[in-house]
């Protein structure tokens, strides 16, 4: 063969994926080809199906296990895949009785054509007597849905919650039936009853034990010797939890209690046989109650895990301590010291009472005569953890013997003798020995009184009572059931005295549960109601104690209590943690922020948190959306800088309101708000205000503002006084220049308005604009000074005159001299004049973006040597921000206005004499080279005829529209 040339030494060893032993995993593919199957047949025939490691050497990527499974399950010609015969099933049952249900390879040798896997599946899915082959009940389906929500498709795990159902049967029933009924169960609300119930897993061995007992009962109702010995050996090894239900005993009856004997009179056994549809009423003298001891720090009954009831031939039910997996070994050892087995002659019920706290986990009965156990109540045993809530034990359990004669003769009295009772004042101390217990003996009393039957209802079965609810009856029990078995008729329950007699101040809520009518039908479903939402902790046996006792450091979880439900959650008081500082800054620092000022010496802020400092500023949270309460330290700095911004911005804001100021003056005939006027200031600091009609008003600035200005605009006075001081300094400088016989270069700046006529109205026409002025126009640093000041040529005006332009956008004059309304608003030609200085430096915006600056520097409107200081005065307008497109649009509009206005003035007023040209050359030489380089457009060598002044200016000013 070709495959024989391939040896293991020639192969490359594969990784073992974490395994340290076993064959190397050389393949993960599961598809076998036809060639591989043929090679496997020949190899098996060559080695006679014995040496599978040698057989695996014929394949490069196959292990010996894969080859074995492929041969046994698929390729073996002797393999039988058909249905099982009756003879094969009988052989499997006999072999399992001989070898046990684990040696499947040995069992398969006696069944030709069958492998161990087939035998195992046949037993667990069909032949096992513990399998429940009946139709699925509604409770089982609801329990399956509940368990499937937790474990999913782990069918082997689901078998622990559904005794008698195999994993294969559960899987088939889920996909065939339950999965389709899921929506109907959800809508009907039946599934909600199982949501609050925790799942209690079952031991398969317990079901097998009950089934094994059933199968080994002989005709006389007795166990054979082999079955009895096997049961004894099992119970000696471990106490197995068992849940008894009607379905476990469908094909026969099992004797329970003291009437069940390994051998005895069959007639007596038949009279006391337990059937699935009969009820069981125990007598008080035959009741054996085993109560687990609970330590002082385990008062919370919710800490106990699930537990079951176990059966044994010792004539009682026992509490399974082995299932308390979460309890320490010492605790379990103390529990094991409780005497569990009781015989029929035992008339006592032992109650473990450590630390004055009783925790009744399971009440078990040894008498099988009269236990009231309908089939619908079988599920109560399936969820014993719901019954493990706290119960208050009646004072009647510890009543003195001399109190017996004072009680109604019909009431069953449980009292403890003075010699046996160990509950005293010392039991109030938590240091009492955990092994302390007292014995409650049944009352013997008068001869005519015998203990009445007792129905012990756990706290789970009552919604309003937290005590151990006892319903005593007459000597002859008068409990009857109706036809369908859904109600229990209680005879004369008015004599019952129960529920927390240990305190004189029992609440009405606890007493409202008792039935005062002579007869009343009590639904059985009331006993199956859900547990209360809140767990009950057991009260201590202390006098006058009515409220639940809560201890610190018990580990019991308690919900956060608020002062009032009417108040919002943010009004609560949260005390400061003492140990861990990070608890003060629990989620988003709420604990610190919500701390009341009454309990906190100083207000605490969110950014004091160790983690909040790093994440609060940059993270998005609901706290950042609050207005003023939770501001970061950055906002405090902004509030300080806002004062500087307001001072720097006062000039630009004040002059934009001058027209409003003059409109409110008493002399409304001057009509300052409807025309363009000029204020001339002379050396004596008098202001001459010229309106459009040529009228003039003069006076001191102080008299102007004090006489004309309303009170709400008096804050502009200081701003105008600053302007007055600036004008005086400019006059002094011009005077010095005139004494040196150097012609001063006039500085002009005007406000450009666009009117309906389409032509600009210049406040001071006839002025010449030099190249230095054009350069200064394009410099953002000097815009405020040029806006507030304008010096006129000393040939036309006084050398010391300074004019301030006041512009009103409402009305303007056309060519004919008539006043015309202007619908468009006045528009400043510079964005630097109309916005406050240094506003928004600390806030991120598109103006400070490096992309904006990089795109602005090589712009044709700005030279490449523009410094950062010049860029510092480019800000966003107040109360708004621009995007990148809006920024460039705003700059282009205003710089176009600069260029158009400067070019129009130069072309319209172009001197032709030699003196003017010499003056231009002198200006060019004396100008700062830095300013000269900042011009927008240079028309130095361009001249136009004077007659075309209007046409040229109109052409150049098209960009302003």
Swiss-Prot record:
DNA-binding region location: 52-75, 104-127, 155-178
Domain HTH myb-type positions: 24-75, 76-131, 132-182
Induction: Slightly induced by salicylic acid (SA). Expressed in a cell cycle-dependent manner, with highest levels 2 hours before the peak of mitotic index in cells synchronized by aphidicolin. Activated by CYCB1. Accumulates at powdery mildew (e.g. G.orontii) infected cells.
Annotated Gene3D superfamilies: Homeodomain-like (1.10.10.60)
Residue spans of biased composition, Polar residues class: 391-405, 416-430, 764-781
Gene Ontology MF terms: DNA-binding transcription activator activity, RNA polymerase II-specific; DNA-binding transcription factor activity; sequence-specific DNA binding; transcription cis-regulatory region binding
Positions of the UniProt region annotated as Disordered: 1-33, 390-457, 534-555, 756-781
An individual GO BP term: response to salicylic acid
Subunit note: Component of a DREAM-like complex which modulates a variety of developmentally regulated genes and of the mitotic genes in proliferating and differentiated cells. Associates with CDKA-1, RBR1 and E2FB, but not with E2FC, in proliferating cells, at early stages of leaves development.
Role, per record: Transcription factor that binds 5'-AACGG-3' motifs in gene promoters. Involved in the regulation of cytokinesis, probably via the activation of several G2/M phase-specific genes transcription (e.g. KNOLLE). Required for the maintenance of diploidy.
Name of the protein in its database record: Transcription factor MYB3R-4
Origin species: Arabidopsis thaliana
Gene that specifies this protein: MYB3R4
């Amino acid at each position: 063969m070709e495959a024989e040339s391939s040896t293991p030494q020639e192969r490359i060893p594969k990784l073992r994926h974490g395994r340290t032993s076993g064959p190397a995993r050389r393949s993960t593919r599961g598809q076998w080809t036809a060639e591989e199957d043929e090679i496997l047949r020949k190899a098996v025939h060559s080695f006679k199906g014995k040496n599978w490691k040698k057989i695996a050497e014929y394949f490069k990527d196959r292990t010996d296990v894969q080859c074995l499974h492929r041969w046994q399950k698929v390729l073996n010609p002797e393999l039988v895949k058909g249905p099982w015969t009756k003879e094969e099933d009988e052989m499997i049952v006999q072999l399992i009785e001989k070898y046990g249900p684990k040696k499947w390879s040995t069992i398969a040798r006696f069944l030709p054509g069958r492998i161990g896997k087939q035998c195992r599946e046949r037993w667990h899915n069909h032949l096992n007597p513990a399998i429940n082959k009946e139709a699925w009940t509604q409770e089982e389906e609801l329990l399956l849905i509940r368990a499937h929500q937790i474990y999913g498709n782990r069918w082997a795990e689901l078998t622990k919650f559904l005794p008698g159902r195999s994993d294969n049967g559960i899987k088939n029933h889920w996909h065939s039936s339950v999965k389709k009924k899921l929506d109907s169960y959800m809508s009907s609300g039946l599934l909600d009853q199982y949501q609050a119930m925790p799942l209690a897993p079952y031991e398969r061995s317990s079901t097998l034990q009950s089934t094994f007992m059933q199968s080994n009962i002989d005709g006389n109702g007795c166990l054979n010797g082999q079955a009895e010995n096997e049961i004894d050996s099992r119970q000696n090894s471990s106490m197995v939890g068992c849940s008894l239900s009607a379905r476990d005993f469908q094909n026969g009856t099992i004797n329970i209690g003291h009437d069940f004997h390994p051998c005895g009179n069959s007639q007596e056994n038949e009279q006391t046989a337990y059937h699935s549809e009969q009820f069981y009423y125990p007598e008080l003298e035959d009741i054996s109650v085993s109560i687990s001891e609970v330590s002082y720090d385990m008062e919370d009954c919710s800490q106990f895990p699930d537990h079951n009831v176990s059966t044994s031939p010792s004539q009682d039910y026992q509490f399974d301590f082995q299932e308390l997996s979460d309890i320490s070994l010492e605790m379990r050892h103390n529990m094991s010291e409780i005497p569990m087995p009781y015989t029929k002659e035992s008339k006592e019920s032992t109650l473990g009472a450590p630390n004055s706290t009783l925790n009744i986990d399971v009440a078990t009965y040894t008498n099988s005569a009269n236990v009231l156990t309908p089939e619908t109540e079988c599920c109560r045993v399936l969820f014993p953890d719901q019954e493990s809530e706290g119960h208050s034990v009646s004072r009647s359990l510890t009543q003195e013997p001399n109190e017996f004669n004072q009680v109604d003769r019909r009431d069953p009295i449980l009292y403890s003798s003075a010699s046996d009772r160990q509950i005293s004042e010392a039991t109030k101390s938590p240091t009492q020995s955990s092994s302390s217990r007292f014995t409650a003996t049944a009352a013997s009393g008068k001869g005519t009184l015998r203990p009445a039957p007792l129905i012990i209802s756990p706290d789970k079965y009552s919604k309003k009572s937290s005590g151990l609810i006892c319903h005593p009856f007459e000597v002859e029990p008068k409990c009857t059931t109706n036809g369908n078995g859904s109600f229990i008729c209680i005879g004369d329950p008015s004599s019952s005295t129960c529920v927390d007699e240990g305190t004189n101040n029992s609440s009405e809520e606890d007493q409202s549960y008792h039935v005062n009518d002579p007869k009343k039908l009590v639904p059985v479903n009331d006993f199956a109601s859900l547990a209360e939402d809140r767990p009950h902790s057991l009260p201590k046996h202390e006098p006058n104690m009515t409220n639940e006792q809560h201890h610190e450091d018990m580990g019991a979880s308690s919900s956060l209590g608020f002062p009032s439900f009417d108040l919002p959650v943010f009004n609560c008081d949260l005390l400061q943690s003492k140990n861990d500082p990070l608890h003060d800054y629990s989620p988003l620092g709420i604990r610190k922020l919500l701390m009341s000022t009454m309990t906190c010496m100083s207000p605490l802020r969110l950014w004091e948190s160790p983690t909040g400092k790093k994440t609060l500023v940059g993270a998005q949270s609901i706290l950042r959306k609050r207005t003023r309460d939770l501001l970061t330290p950055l906002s405090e700095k902004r509030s300080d800088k806002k004062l500087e911004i307001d001072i720097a911005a006062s000039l630009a804001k004040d002059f934009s309101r001058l027209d409003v100021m003059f409109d409110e003056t008493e002399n409304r005939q001057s009509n300052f708000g409807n025309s363009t006027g000029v204020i001339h200031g002379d050396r004596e600091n008098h202001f001459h205000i010229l309106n459009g009609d040529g009228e003039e008003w003069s006076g001191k600035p102080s008299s102007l503002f004090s006489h004309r200005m309303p009170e709400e605009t008096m804050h502009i006075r200081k701003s105008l006084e600053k302007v007055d001081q600036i004008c005086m300094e400019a006059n002094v400088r011009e005077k010095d220049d005139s004494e040196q016989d150097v012609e001063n270069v006039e500085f002009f700046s005007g406000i450009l308005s666009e009117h309906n006529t389409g032509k600009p109205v210049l406040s001071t026409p006839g002025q010449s604009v030099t190249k230095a002025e054009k350069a200064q126009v394009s410099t953002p640093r000097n815009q405020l000074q040029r806006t507030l000041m304008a010096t006129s040529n000393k040939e036309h005006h006084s050398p010391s005159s300074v004019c301030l332009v006041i512009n009103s956008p409402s009305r303007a004059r056309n060519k004919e001299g008539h006043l015309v309304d202007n619908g468009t608003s006045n528009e400043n030609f510079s964005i630097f004049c109309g916005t406050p200085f240094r506003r928004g430096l600390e806030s991120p915006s598109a103006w400070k973006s490096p992309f904006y600056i990089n795109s602005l520097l090589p712009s044709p409107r700005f030279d490449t040597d523009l410094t950062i200081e010049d860029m510092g005065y480019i800000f966003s307008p107040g109360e708004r921000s621009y995007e990148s497109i809006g920024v460039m649009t705003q700059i282009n509009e205003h710089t176009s206005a600069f260029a158009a206005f400067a070019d129009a003035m130069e072309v319209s007023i172009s001197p032709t004499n030699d003196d003017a040209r010499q003056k231009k050359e002198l200006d060019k030489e004396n100008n700062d080279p830095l300013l000269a380089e900042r011009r927008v457009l240079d028309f130095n060598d361009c001249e136009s005829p004077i007659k075309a002044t209007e046409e040229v200016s109109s052409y150049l000013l098209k960009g302003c529209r």
